Amino acid sequence: MQVNIDTQAELGLSVTEATTRAQIIGATIATIADHGYARTTFARIKERAGLSSTRLISYHFTNKAGLMQAVLSTVSETKSEYLRERSEGVDPADRPGNLRAYIETSVAFLRDYPQCERVLVEMAAHADDRDGWAMTGVMVGQLRTGALQRQLEQGRKEGAFGDISPEIVALSIAQAVDGVAAAYAADPSVDLDRYGRELADLFARATAR
């Protein structure tokens, strides 16, 4: 995955430092996606990034926790920006419309950023890693259901949705998207657009007044 160098330069780094840092983050994302979180080592990241030494990783991130924080922040920003851009044409006050856009866009994200989705799954499964970033579980949970649950709660208060449990519906949507991700990983020929539409239809009926 190509990481935006500009976001690294904002940390006050030189162009060379920002480029190397972005290169390491991108290589870590690719390594986790290919080998899984547990088998991702500095040695594998070094090889993937084409670095001369693992010491370059330690120089930029100090330890595994710092690297994983940067990786998760990058993936989170990528997904949040993707969802935001793909939902720009929907009226913010149209709660059902925003719910549909969220579901369809979340499914489309699987196709456009498969490595990011794999990283989220892997990091969620290893959130208790002692050497990892302590806030991993909280951040992944927020990305998976936090914003969606707030959207559902607001829609229920406004009368846009029926008498639903926002927490249960948000979790159900997240798990449904996980199911699509698993199906897509097993068979890349699946029609993700159709999956997105049908899931959106399903939850539109489930949340209707």
Locate the predicted segments by residue.
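Generic hydrophobic, amphipathic alpha-helix propensity
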Residues: 20-29, 45, 71-83, 148
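Short helix-capping/turn signature of helix-turn-helix
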Residues: 61, 122-129
